[in-house]
Curated annotation (Swiss-Prot):
Species of provenance: Trichormus variabilis (strain ATCC 29413 / PCC 7937) (Anabaena variabilis)
Source taxonomy: Bacteria, Bacillati, Cyanobacteriota, Cyanophyceae, Nostocales
Signal peptide from the UniProt entry: none
Protein name: Large ribosomal subunit protein uL5
GO cellular component terms attached to this protein's record: ribonucleoprotein complex; ribosome
Function: This is one of the proteins that bind and probably mediate the attachment of the 5S RNA into the large ribosomal subunit, where it forms part of the central protuberance. In the 70S ribosome it contacts protein S13 of the 30S subunit (bridge B1b), connecting the 2 subunits; this bridge is implicated in subunit movement. Contacts the P site tRNA; the 5S rRNA and some of its associated proteins might help stabilize positioning of ribosome-bound tRNAs.
Length: 182
């Protein structure tokens, strides 16, 4: 498999820039992407097998990897959930697939969001990881408008080795993440 554009960019330009910016003494101190998780909670669709299948195929099409069905650990009567019922689906992307998905997300999908002015720089978790909520799956070019039955969102978490939010933000900004000005 050929090296993706973002991996080459990371190795050739991002590592030297961040080393200089944060005065790292070792190349292994530079933050890097570890994994990207794509998650969708099913909510009301948990009782509907057809909607679960549609979600599975959509996430598989978007990420290029088969999703795992997450199940309820215990019953919650208020939400009409029994133990073992499907409550969501998720995919963990690493390596080349992660870089390929991240490249498509930054360059193709995010600009397709209606009234897009950049993503919020406040969604970091304090440890340099970023989580992004997408309201509709139509922003991904792999999804055809006619093939969906209902508009559903998904969560994308970008996990890095950064020690704090400042390092994580610098890393993602160098990758080309379109952050909104504060």
């Amino acid at each position: 498999m050929a090296t993706t554009r973002l991996k080459t960019l990371y190795q050739e330009t991002i590592i030297p820039k961040l080393t200089q910016q944060f005065q790292y003494t070792n190349v292994h101190q530079v933050p890097k992407l570890v994994k990207i998780t794509v998650n969708r909670g099913l909510g009301e669709a948990a009782q509907n097998a057809k909607s679960l299948e549609a979600s599975l195929t959509e996430i598989a099409t978007i990420t290029g990897q088969k999703p795992v069905v997450t199940r309820a650990k215990k019953a919650i009567a208020g939400f009409k959930i029994r133990q073992g019922m499907p409550v969501g689906i998720m995919v963990t992307l690493r390596g080349e697939r992660m870089y390929a998905f991240f490249d498509r997300l930054i360059s193709l999908s995010l600009p397709r969001i209606r009234d897009f002015r950049g993503i919020s720089p406040k969604s970091f978790d304090g440890r340099g990881n970023y989580t992004l909520g997408v309201r509709e799956q139509l922003i991904f070019p792999e999804i055809e408008y006619d093939s969906i039955d209902q508009i559903r969102g998904l969560d994308i978490s970008i996990i890095t080795t950064a020690k704090n939010d400042e390092e994580g933000r610098a890393l993602l900004k160098e990758f080309g993440m379109p952050f909104r000005d504060q």
